[in-house]
Amino acid sequence: MREIEISREPVELYKILKFEGVAASGGEAKSLIDSGQVSVNGAVETRKRKKIVSGDVIRFKDEEFKVRLAPL
């Protein structure tokens, strides 16, 4: 499981997928989410603007990412 550090919370799900290189663009990230290929905390998530906070676990295919807030 890979860790993702965010500088503030919440962050929209599609932005995390884009910035982590899972998707080449925001549009591609939204499409992946829309098609049910992404889960958050074990449940399929289809809301592109789902607010992600520290402690959330995102899964896409065989990749898992744990989100944590970066220290100040």
Q: Where are the regions a protein language model picked out?
A:
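C-terminal structural segments of small proteins and small subunits
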Residues: 47-72
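A detector for short, charged/polar N-terminal pre-domain segments
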Residues: 1-11
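A basic, amphipathic helix-loop patch mediating RNA/tRNA/ribosome contacts
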Residues: 11-54
